[in-house]
C-alpha cells in the first residue's frame, strides 16, 4: 500500500486528490499538509473533503508529513513546490508536482533537487491532455513549416498564472517538433500595428472568466484549411486521478525528474 500525503489539502484540488486517494486501489492517505496558521489545521482531512472521517488531521508540519509518507502530491505554487521538493529530497521521499507557472530557472532547480529522488513534474495530470501532447508532436512534424500555429487557452477567473502551464507545454512540444526555440518564437502579445506574422512564431492567447476548469486548442492554420486539436476539462477529477496514478507509479523508480509522458508510457 502506497502512503500518499497531500500538500494544499484544504484547497479545491487538494480535496479532490484526497477523494481520489480513497477511491484508488493500492493507495492510502497518510498525511495532509497546509501552510502554517491555516484556519483548518487540525481538522480531519476526509471530513473536509466530503469522503468521511479518515483519522488524518490537516497539519502544518512539513517534516512530519513528509516523514510519514512514501510520496507527496503537491498542487500549490512553484515557490512552495520547490520547498516541498527539497524537504522530500532530504528524507528520500518521492514527490508528484502539478503546480504551474515555473520559470526556466525554477525548472532547472527542480531537476537539480530531483537528482537523488524520483519526482514527477507535469503541468497537467490528465491522460487526455498528455495524449494531446503526443498527437501535437506528430501533427507538427507532418505539417512542418507550411502551417501557422496559434494556441488559445481558457481558465476560470481565479487562476493566478498566464498562460497556463499546459498551454506553454503544448507550445514547447510543437516548437521542439519543428526545430524551433520556444522561448524565442512564442508571441504572447499583439496590439496596434505590430507588423505581419512571422512564419516561425507560435501565438499564445489567454482567456480568463467564470468557472472554466480548463480548455486548450492548438490551431494549425494553412492556406485553405485549418486543423484544430482541442481538450476541454469538464471536472477536476481527471487531474486528481492522474496525480494519484503518478504517485503510485513514481515510488520505487530511479532518481530523476519525470513527467506524465513517462507515467503513461507515451515516450
Swiss-Prot record:
InterPro entries: DapB_C, DapB_N, DapB_N_CS, DHDPR_bac, NAD(P)-bd_dom_sf
Residue positions binding (S)-2,3,4,5-tetrahydrodipicolinate: 156, 165-166
Binding site for NAD(+): 8-13, 34, 98-100, 122-125
EC category: oxidoreductase
PROSITE patterns linked: DAPB (PS01298)
EC number per UniProt: 1.17.1.8
Catalytic activity: (S)-2,3,4,5-tetrahydrodipicolinate + NAD(+) + H2O = (2S,4S)-4-hydroxy-2,3,4,5-tetrahydrodipicolinate + NADH + H(+); (S)-2,3,4,5-tetrahydrodipicolinate + NADP(+) + H2O = (2S,4S)-4-hydroxy-2,3,4,5-tetrahydrodipicolinate + NADPH + H(+)
Binding site for NADP(+): 35
Annotated Gene Ontology cellular component terms: cytosol
Protein task: Catalyzes the conversion of 4-hydroxy-tetrahydrodipicolinate (HTPA) to tetrahydrodipicolinate.
Protein name in the entry: 4-hydroxy-tetrahydrodipicolinate reductase
Gene behind the chain: dapB
Amino acid at each position: 500500500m502506497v502512503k500518499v500525503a497531500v500538500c494544499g489539502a484544504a484547497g479545491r484540488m487538494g480535496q479532490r486528490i484526497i477523494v481520489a486517494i480513497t477511491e484508488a486501489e493500492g493507495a492510502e492517505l497518510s498525511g495532509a499538509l497546509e501552510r502554517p496558521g491555516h484556519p483548518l489545521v487540525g481538522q480531519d482531512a476526509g471530513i473536509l473533503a466530503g469522503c468521511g472521517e479518515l483519522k488524518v488531521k490537516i497539519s502544518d508540519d512539513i517534516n512530519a508529513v513528509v516523514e510519514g509518507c512514501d510520496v507527496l502530491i503537491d498542487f500549490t505554487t512553484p515557490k512552495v513546490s520547490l520547498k516541498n521538493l527539497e524537504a522530500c529530497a532530504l528524507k528520500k521521499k518521492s514527490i508528484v508536482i502539478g503546480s504551474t507557472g515555473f520559470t526556466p530557472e525554477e525548472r532547472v532547480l527542480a531537476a537539480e533537487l530531483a537528482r537523488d529522488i524520483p519526482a514527477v513534474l507535469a503541468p497537467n495530470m490528465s491522460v487526455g491532455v498528455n495524449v494531446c501532447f503526443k498527437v501535437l508532436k506528430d501533427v507538427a512534424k507532418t505539417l512542418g513549416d507550411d502551417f501557422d500555429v496559434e494556441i488559445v487557452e481558457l481558465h476560470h477567473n481565479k487562476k493566478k498564472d498566464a498562460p497556463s502551464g499546459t498551454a506553454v507545454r503544448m507550445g514547447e512540444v510543437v516548437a521542439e517538433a519543428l526545430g524551433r526555440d520556444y522561448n524565442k518564437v512564442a508571441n504572447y502579445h499583439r496590439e496596434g500595428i505590430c507588423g505581419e506574422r512571422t512564419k516561425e512564431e507560435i501565438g499564445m492567447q489567454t482567456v480568463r472568466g467564470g468557472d472554466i476548469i480548463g480548455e486548450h486548442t492548438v490551431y494549425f492554420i494553412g492556406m485553405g484549411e485549418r486543423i484544430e486539436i482541442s481538450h476541454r476539462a469538464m471536472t477536476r477529477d481527471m487531474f486528481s486521478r492522474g496525480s494519484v496514478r503518478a504517485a503510485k507509479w513514481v515510488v520505487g523508480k530511479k532518481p530523476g525528474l519525470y513527467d506524465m509522458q513517462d507515467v503513461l508510457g507515451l515516450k
